[in-house]
Amino acid sequence: MKKIDKSKPVLVTGANGYVASWLVKQLLDNGITVHAAVRNPSNEKKVAHLKELAINSKGEIKFFKSDLLEKGSYQEAMQGCELVYHTASPFTSNYKDAQKELIEPAQNGTANVLESANQIDSVKRIVVTSSCAAMYTDAIDSVNAPGGVLTEDVWNTTASLDYQPYSYSKTLAEKKAWEMQEQQNRWDLVTINPCLVLGPPLNLKQTTSESLNILKMLGGGDMKMGAPKIGIGIVDVRDVAEAHYKAGFTPEAKGRYITAAHNSDFLEMGTVLLPKYGDKYPLPKKALPKWLLKIVGPMTNKLFTRKFVSNNVNIPWNADNSKIKNELGMSFRSLKETMEDSFQIMIDQGIFK
C-alpha cells in the first residue's frame, strides 16, 4: 500500500498520447505538477494542447525529451517523482517489421522506464498502461476463458510474432513489468488494461490511435453495406484517464485492472450512432455475413485473415469489470455518449469529406 504525496511531481511517459493527454488534464486539474516525457518537446504541433491545458488549470507542466528505446532517457524526468505513469507504447496495424516496430519498443521501453525507477529512490508506485490484449487475442479466447469471461487472472496465450503481434507485444511488455517489480521492494506496480479505447481526442490532428481509424471507416462509408459483427470491448478515453488517476492515488490499488465499459461489437458501434447521424452519414445498418468476410476479408485488409474471421466474427466478447468498480470506484460512460462524442469531434474537424 503506497500513499502518494500530491505536492510531488508526477511523471507521464508518452504524455502527448491519446489516453495520456486526458490523464495529464486530470492531473493538472487536481493541481499536480506533471513531468511530461515526450520524444520531441519542441514539436509544437504535438505539445501545444498540453501547454494550453496547463494554462487553464491549477497545476503546472514541465517537458522532458525522452525516447522509449534510449536507456536512461527517463531519469531526469523521474527525479523527485513518487508516482510514474508509463503510457508510451506503439499501437499500429501499419507495420512492416513487427519485431522492430511493436515487440521491441513495447518490451524494451517498459524495461527502460522500470530500470530508471530502480535508480530513482523517490519512486513509490508505477502505473503501466497495458491492455486487454495482454489477456486475449480473439473474441473466441473470452468464450474459452474460465466461465466464458475474461478476468484479471487470464493471460494471453494465443498471440505470437506471426499472429496478432500487437497483442503479443502488450503481453510481453506487461509480463516484463511484473517480473521487474518482483525483483525489488521499493515501488509497487499497478496495470490498467483497457479494451478498445474510443472517445474525443484532445489533439485530433496529431492522434495516431488505431481506434480512430475504425471511426473513420464507420463514418466514411467503408461499412455502408454492413459491418462485421466482431465481438469487442469498448471504453471511453476519459474513463481510462480517470482509471489511471485512481490507480495512482488509491493507496490500496493493486495488480491488474480490466478497464472495459461495454461488451460490444463493430455493428453496434455503428447502429448506436444511427438515431443522431444516420440521415447524413453512410453508417452500417446490418451485419456482414461471416461466409462473405472469409472470402473478401483477406483481400481488403491484411489483418482480416480467415483465422481472424473464424475467431472473431459473430462471437461475443465478455470481460468482468467488477474489480475496477469495487476497488477503484470506477463508473463508465454510456456507449452512446462515447460514440456520439467521438463522431462529433471528427465531423467538427472535417475528417469526413
Positions of predicted regions on the chain:
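Conserved Rossmann-fold NAD(P)-dependent oxidoreductase catalytic core, especially the SDR/UDP-sugar
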Residues: P90, K96-Y166, V190
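Alpha-helical substrate-binding/gating segment
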Residues: L215-Y257, A261-S264
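Mid/C-terminal beta-alpha module of Rossmann-like enzyme folds, strongest
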Residues: A243-R306, N326, L335, M339-K353
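Glycine/proline-rich active-site loop of Rossmann-fold NAD(P)-dependent oxidoreductases
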Residues: Q183-W187, G199-I214, A247-Y257
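Active-site Tyr-X1-5-Lys
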Residues: S160-L189
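Glycine-rich "substrate-gating" loop/helix at the edge of Rossmann-like oxidoreductase active sites
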Residues: D162-P165, G199-T207, M223-R238
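NAD(P)H-binding glycine-rich loop region in Rossmannoid oxidoreductase-like domains
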Residues: P41-N108
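N-terminal Rossmann NAD(P)H-binding glycine-rich loop of SDR-like oxidoreductase domains
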Residues: K3-I32
